[in-house]
């Protein structure tokens, strides 16, 4: 019997991401898995139900998608109620935030589901393809600078015009991890003067 992989629509307010793309769904289908995606799961990320269907995934209601699922993929872990009908001992791969959401972790244990908290995936070469934090931190650093530029209300680069000279914005980045490095690169590309600090020595 083929492995059944389910993807539910994210329920958290303001969450527009989806745990699977049609491209990856197509790869899973090619490997012999059955992929089921809830209707509208990808709309927030501009991925249509039709795109998932073309990739070979089943598209349906939440109950139909999760029925007999062996693996459930999520950006944020769904409540156990949303997993009703999944196979006993089903694996759920998502971000769980277990230290703040201990009640949800306890509910998973009581229901008999295997919780794979993807944010704790070790940052080693072998696990690089499953490193959810790096990809999201990269985007966070990029978006942080764009948001700051929008709030700043003036131009980032130096501009010499007939009306006078506008000095380049000075951007200070605290921390040069994945997000910080992307923030530095984005601010530099926008023309700002950038400096940074980190708790680690150079």
Predicted regions and their residues:
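An N-terminal-biased, well-structured beta-alpha scaffold segment characteristic
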Residues: 2-107, 111
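Short linear motifs at secondary-structure transitions and domain/linker junctions
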Residues: 9-12, 47-50, 65-70, 122, ...
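Alpha-helix boundary/capping detector
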Residues: 54-55, 134-135, 174
